[in-house]
C-alpha cells in the first residue's frame, strides 16, 4: 500500500469511553479502497465497539473519523447509505421468508421495488435459493443463512461492507467457503472491513491490525507481520504481540483464546 492508494476509512485518535473504561484507546489507521482489511483481536479487545462507531451506530468520545468520504459526526446518514453491515448473528429476521428479508433490507437501503425484485432474483439464482424463496430463514442451514446475510448486506452495492465476526459459530469448511464470497465482493470493487478472532483468517486479508486491550498493537500485511516477529503463522504473531507465553496460553479464560481452524 502507498500514498497513491485511495483511502475509504480514515481514523485519527479515536477514543471511546464507557465511564472510566476506554474500550477504544487512541486508535489511528487508514483503510484503502478495494482492500480486505482485517481488524483482529481476542474477544473483548474493542473490535465491535470500533466497528459500531465506524458504521455510525455509536458516537465516539473523541477523534476524527471519515468513512466512505463522509464525516462520522456530521454526515452519519450518508455514511449508512454507502456501507453494508453484517454481524455475527447474520442480521436476518428468522421469522420471515428469504424473499421477505431481501425485500425488507432492500427497502432499508433505499432501493426501488423494481431494483429489489431484480436483485432478489439475481441473488437467489446466484446462491441457488430459488426453491427456498418462500421458506422461513429459520428453516435454512446455518451456512446458507450466512451466505444470504452477506449477500443482503451488499444488495445495494455499497462502497464498503463491515463484517463483524461473520464466521462465528460455523464450521471450518463453511468459514472457508464464506471467504470465497468475500473475495468475490472485493473483486467487484467493494472494500471489506472484517473483524475476527480467528487468526487463521488473517492470512486471507490484504492487511491486518491487531487489537490488544483497546489499542492497535500492530498493523501490516500478514507476511510482513510474520517476518517482523519471526514466526510461521498469525496465531504466533498474536501471541508475540499480546506478550502471552505459549505455556501460559492454555491457562487463559476461554473468551480470550484465539480460535484456530481444525
How should these model regions be labeled?
Residues 103, 107, 114-132:
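Conserved ABC ATPase "signature" region
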Residues 95, 136-143:
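Conserved ABC ATPase signature
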Residues 219-220:
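ABC ATPase "signature
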Residues 161-165:
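Catalytic Walker B motif of ABC-type/P-loop ATPase nucleotide-binding domains
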Residues 63-71, 78-79:
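Conserved ABC transporter NBD signature motif
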Amino acid at each position: 500500500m502507498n500514498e497513491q492508494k485511495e483511502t475509504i476509512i480514515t481514523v485519527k485518535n479515536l477514543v471511546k469511553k464507557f465511564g472510566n473504561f476506554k474500550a477504544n484507546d487512541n486508535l489511528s489507521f487508514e483503510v484503502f479502497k478495494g482492500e480486505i482489511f482485517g481488524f483482529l483481536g481476542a474477544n473483548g479487545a474493542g473490535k465491535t465497539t470500533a466497528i459500531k462507531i465506524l458504521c455510525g451506530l455509536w458516537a465516539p468520545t473523541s477523534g476524527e473519523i471519515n468513512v466512505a468520504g463522509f464525516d462520522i459526526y456530521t454526515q452519519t446518514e450518508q455514511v449508512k447509505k454507502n456501507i453494508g453491515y453484517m454481524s455475527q448473528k447474520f442480521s436476518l429476521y428468522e421469522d420471515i421468508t428469504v424473499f421477505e428479508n431481501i425485500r425488507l433490507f432492500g427497502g432499508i437501503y433505499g432501493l426501488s421495488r423494481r431494483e429489489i425484485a431484480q436483485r432478489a432474483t439475481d441473488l437467489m439464482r446466484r446462491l441457488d435459493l430459488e426453491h427456498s424463496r418462500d421458506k422461513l430463514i429459520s428453516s435454512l442451514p446455518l451456512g446458507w443463512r450466512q451466505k444470504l446475510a452477506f449477500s443482503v448486506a451488499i444488495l445495494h452495492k455499497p462502497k464498503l461492507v463491515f463484517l463483524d465476526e461473520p464466521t462465528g459459530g460455523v464450521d471450518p469448511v463453511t468459514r472457508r467457503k464464506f471467504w470465497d464470497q468475500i473475495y468475490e465482493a472485493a473483486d467487484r470493487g467493494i472494500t471489506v472491513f472484517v473483524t475476527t478472532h480467528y487468526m487463521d483468517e488473517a492470512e486471507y486479508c490484504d492487511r491486518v491490525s491487531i487489537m490488544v486491550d483497546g489499542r492497535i498493537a500492530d498493523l501490516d500485511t500478514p507476511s510482513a507481520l510474520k517476518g517482523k516477529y519471526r514466526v510461521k503463522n498469525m496465531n504466533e504473531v498474536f501471541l508475540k504481540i499480546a506478550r502471552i507465553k505459549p505455556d501460559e496460553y492454555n491457562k487463559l479464560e476461554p473468551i480470550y483464546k484465539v480460535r484456530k481452524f481444525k
